Amino acid sequence: MKNIAVLGSTGSIGTQTLDVVRGHRELFHISVLAANSSDELLEQQIREFEPELAVLSDEAAYARLKSRYTGKTQLAGGRQAFIDAAAYPAVDTVVTSMMGFAGLEPTMKALDAKKNIALANKETLVVAGEIVMRRAKEQGVSILPVDSEHCAFFQCLQGEKRETIEKLLLTCSGGPFRGKKREALIGATKAQVLAHPTWNMGQKITVDSASLVNKGLEVIEAKWLYGVDYDQIQVVVHPQSIIHSMVQFCDGSIIAQLGCPDMKLPIQYALTYPTRQSSDFERLDFWKLKDLTFEKPDTDTFKGLRFAYEAGKMGGSMPCIFNAANEVAVGAFLKGAIHFLDIYDIIEQTMMKRACILEPTLEELFEEDAWARAYAASLLEK
């Protein structure tokens, strides 16, 4: 029986993680549930899964829940309580399914407590990949990717040596605007941006998918997870989202991982590894597959991917700057404060304004994140 902590349990990945647990109650026990502010949904989850601890980062939401709930689960509130939940003693594996830079502190806390990580919070590796991977190695714990693409790489590389990797072929649906040029995106609405053709996800990651920033974040994540150079990571647009990613080896062979687009599959793989367990997930029917097509990404129109490669190759603190500027810009877009294409301008201007720290400490990364957010926010006022 694995004891699981789900950080971000009320979000898209968190709720799908609980779906996986429902299908294998003989394998998993939910010890900790933690969310930001969705107190009503968290209360439902508490009553169903009966964890030892439940946390709400938002103090007002915590107060609301505390006034209603009278069960056995211990409740805690506030940002520090959320971070501390990652190190809960009884937990074996921590699912980090919260969004953005806010995932870094809880992930580091979990690593310091020698917890295995099922990583859905890609920003942790984007911002502090070298530090995080080194800490995991020092602590002797595993970081198992929950992203469908990185889970695909992980499976393709089973039994293979890292030095035999020639290229990681990172697939990308292309998002709702695939094939469109910049002129067609000038008046893109929030509804259009959030209409992803394949995946049902939270709003922030859906915007990132439309801008291809999400694919850029995954490029940087792949660099740290698999120890390859950026020139070895190639993004391939694959609209059907059936091939989740591929690895090309030094002899020219390519191994691909295929499956129906369902996030529960990589979630279950991460939770059950090193074994595979049965599931009732949809099966791929090759007789019904009409075609599998591939395209080169348009990085002139979708500049977020190009900026990610540039930030990654600069290294140091620049991916942190890139990520922070994007988080501010996406937040502003979702509030209707800027246009979709303004996201790229804010990222570019913020990256150009700041010198790169080549070997930043964790403390310096927090400072750089704060600076980038403040500067990006100042651009919104112009």
Indicate where each model-derived feature is located.
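Catalytic, metal-anchored helix/loop core of enzyme active sites in primary metabolism
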Residues: 1-382
